């Protein structure tokens, strides 16, 4: 059977806006969650289970957030949720091979477990509509004007989640004939007399509704991450007539460092540490010195790439510690500027970055002031399977 998914991204998220202190203007589904937009994580959770995924929404950020995924181009959303679903269904109906089954998923639910999605699909073999849900366990009170008027029995009460699954033809027909608002598509089937089955949902399948939900979602993601550590070491000789660039900052000195790029030994060793933690080789693998494209290149570009690779793998940087080894120049006066520059390039808080210096007590090539050495240690968190 051919399975399609509608990924809804037209909602504005007014409750989230009211609770957020961040000042960001983007809708909740486009907020960054451990290095990826919320909606991208939602799409990636569905893709292994479906043949076609169709985003529904008009925000310019939608295409950017889903760039590179094997999905259909977005279709416009509607004024209300049911309008967006209907627009998506009509678009699917026009495909050369319309689906047999359709999943409808909120773009603000980024952490739906694979088993929940698969259980919904499996239940559609015997039901026209299926929703994942979790049983209500708290005591429910009904109130008026701040005063309790009733205690509602919780037996048989469930909290509905998505993706909700349906026979495609059934849901399309009901949307064409019932244009009044519903909070979800299961309610359409219920009103028309079609039984809708429930499968076990998950407490991890959190919908981003208020700002505090971001922390809960981060906790879900972090449970599936493993710590990794990377070490970097690099050396560059001094050379007359070049600027001295260290950790992205120009440092006044009589000499610069020799190298194919700008020879920023601090950034080079930090890149090596990051690539090592990711098990992706070293800086030379990504930016080979044999390629003249990188001749005299600002090494900031290399570090931006290394940081992007962490995020593309679904991880984040815990901390980075860079040590510069030289007799001169003195690093201390520039260390804070270096920290801030590295943090900016890696898109992390400066509190996660350390830059310090030491000497070799006038021993060896650094003691003879023939060059500068640098070491770096990084700690990152990435998914257990190493995939985004």
UniProtKB/Swiss-Prot annotation:
4-CDP-2-C-methyl-D-erythritol 2-phosphate binds at residues 234-236, 260-261, 282-284, 358-361, 365, 368. Residues 228-388 are annotated as: 2-C-methyl-D-erythritol 2,4-cyclodiphosphate synthase. Keywords: Isoprene biosynthesis, Lyase, Metal-binding, Multifunctional enzyme, Nucleotidyltransferase, Transferase. Residues 1-228 are annotated as: 2-C-methyl-D-erythritol 4-phosphate cytidylyltransferase. It catalyses: 2-C-methyl-D-erythritol 4-phosphate + CTP + H(+) = 4-CDP-2-C-methyl-D-erythritol + diphosphate; 4-CDP-2-C-methyl-D-erythritol 2-phosphate = 2-C-methyl-D-erythritol 2,4-cyclic diphosphate + CMP. It comes from the Bacteria. Its EC number is 2.7.7.60, 4.6.1.12. The record marks 154, 207 as: Positions MEP for the nucleophilic attack. The record marks 15, 28, 260, 359 as: Transition state stabilizer. Pathway: Isoprenoid biosynthesis; isopentenyl diphosphate biosynthesis via DXP pathway; isopentenyl diphosphate from 1-deoxy-D-xylulose 5-phosphate: step 2/6; Isoprenoid biosynthesis; isopentenyl diphosphate biosynthesis via DXP pathway; isopentenyl diphosphate from 1-deoxy-D-xylulose 5-phosphate: step 4/6. Its cofactor is a divalent metal cation. GO terms for molecular function: 2-C-methyl-D-erythritol 2,4-cyclodiphosphate synthase activity; 2-C-methyl-D-erythritol 4-phosphate cytidylyltransferase activity; metal ion binding. A divalent metal cation binds at residues 234, 236, 268. GO terms for biological process: isopentenyl diphosphate biosynthetic process, methylerythritol 4-phosphate pathway; terpenoid biosynthetic process. In the N-terminal section; belongs to the IspD/TarI cytidylyltransferase family. IspD subfamily. Bifunctional enzyme that catalyzes the formation of 4-diphosphocytidyl-2-C-methyl-D-erythritol from CTP and 2-C-methyl-D-erythritol 4-phosphate (MEP) (IspD), and catalyzes the conversion of 4-diphosphocytidyl-2-C-methyl-D-erythritol 2-phosphate (CDP-ME2P) to 2-C-methyl-D-erythritol 2,4-cyclodiphosphate (ME-CPP) with a corresponding release of cytidine 5-monophosphate (CMP) (IspF). This is Bifunctional enzyme IspD/IspF. It comes from Gluconobacter oxydans (strain 621H).
């Amino acid at each position: 059977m051919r399975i399609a998914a509608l990924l809804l991204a037209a909602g504005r998220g007014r409750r989230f806006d009211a609770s957020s202190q961040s000042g960001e203007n983007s809708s909740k589904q486009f907020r960054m969650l451990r290095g990826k937009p919320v909606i991208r994580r939602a799409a990636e959770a569905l893709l292994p289970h479906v043949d076609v995924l169709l985003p529904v929404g008009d925000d310019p950020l939608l295409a950017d957030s889903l760039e590179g995924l094997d999905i259909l181009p977005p279709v416009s959303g509607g004024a209300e949720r049911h309008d967006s679903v209907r627009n998506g269904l009509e678009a699917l109906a026009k495909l050369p091979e319309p689906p047999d089954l359709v999943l409808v998923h909120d773009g603000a639910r980024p952490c739906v477990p694979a088993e929940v999605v698969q259980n919904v699909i499996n239940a559609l073999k015997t039901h026209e509509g299926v929703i994942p849900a979790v049983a209500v366990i708290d005591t429910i009170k009904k109130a008026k004007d701040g005063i309790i008027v009733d205690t509602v029995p919780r037996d048989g009460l469930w909290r509905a989640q998505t993706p909700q699954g349906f026979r495609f033809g059934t849901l399309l027909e009901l949307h064409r004939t019932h244009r009044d608002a519903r909070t979800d598509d299961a309610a359409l089937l219920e009103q028309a007399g079609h039984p809708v089955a429930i499968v076990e949902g998950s407490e991890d399948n959190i919908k981003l509704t208020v700002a505090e939900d971001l922390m809960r979602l981060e906790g879900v993601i972090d449970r599936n991450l493993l710590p990794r550590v990377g070490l970097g070491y690099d050396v560059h000789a001094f050379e007359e007539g070049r600027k001295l660039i260290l950790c992205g900052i120009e440092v006044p000195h009589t000499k610069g460092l020799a190298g194919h790029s700008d020879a920023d030994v601090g950034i080079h060793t930090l890149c090596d540490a990051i690539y090592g933690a990711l098990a992706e080789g070293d800086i030379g693998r990504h930016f080979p010195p044999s390629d003249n494209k990188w001749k005299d290149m600002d090494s900031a570009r290399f570090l931006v790439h290394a940081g992007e690779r962490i995020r593309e793998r679904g991880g984040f940087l815990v901390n980075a510690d860079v040590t510069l080894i030289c007799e001169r120049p003195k690093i201390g006066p520039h260390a804070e500027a270096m920290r801030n520059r590295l943090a900016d390039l890696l898109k992390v808080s400066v509190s996660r970055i350390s830059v310090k210096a030491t000497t070799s007590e006038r021993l060896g090539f650094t003691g003879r002031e023939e060059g500068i050495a640098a070491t770096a240690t990084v700690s990152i968190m990435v998914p257990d399977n190493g995939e985004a």
